[in-house]
C-alpha cells in the first residue's frame, strides 16, 4: 500500500517536517554515498518559488548528516535557462550555503545513455 505524509509546515519550521518524514519513511544510509538533489531550474531567489527553498535543503542535509553516511553530495544540473551554470545558480538561489560544503557540480561528469522512448533515443545524465 502506498503511504504519503501531509504535515503542516513553513520554511521556518520545515526541520520538524523533515524529521517526521524520515521517521515515517526510514532510510538505511549509514556508510553509503547519498546524493541530495534539490530542484534548481534556474537562477532565482527563494522568494520566487522556482527552486527548492534553501531552508528545506539545509534541513534535509542536517538530518542526513546525523545518519552517518559515508559521503554526502548535494547537486543538480540546472537546465534550459542556466544549463551548465551550476555554481552561479546555487549561489544566487542560496542553495550553496544551505548545502553546507557538500555541493558538487553534477554537470562536470556527463554521460549519454540509451533511452527507449518514442521521443528520445538517448539521454544525458551525470555519472555521479
Question: Where are the model-predicted features located?
Answer:
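N-terminal and secondary-structure boundary signal
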Residues: 1-128
Amino acid at each position: 500500500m502506498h503511504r504519503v505524509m501531509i504535515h503542516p509546515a513553513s520554511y521556518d519550521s520545515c526541520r520538524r517536517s523533515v524529521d517526521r518524514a524520515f521517521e515515517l519513511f526510514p532510510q538505511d544510509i549509514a556508510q553509503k554515498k547519498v546524493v541530495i538533489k534539490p530542484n534548481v531550474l534556474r537562477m532565482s531567489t527563494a522568494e520566487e518559488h522556482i527552486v527548492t527553498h534553501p531552508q528545506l535543503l539545509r534541513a534535509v542535509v542536517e538530518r542526513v548528516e546525523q545518519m552517518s553516511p559515508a559521503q554526502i553530495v548535494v547537486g543538480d544540473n540546472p537546465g534550459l535557462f542556466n544549463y551548465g551554470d551550476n555554481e552561479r545558480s546555487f549561489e544566487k538561489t542560496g542553495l550553496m550555503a544551505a548545502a553546507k560544503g557538500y555541493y558538487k557540480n553534477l554537470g562536470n561528469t556527463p554521460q549519454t545513455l540509451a533511452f527507449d522512448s518514442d521521443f528520445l533515443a538517448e539521454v544525458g545524465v551525470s555519472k555521479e
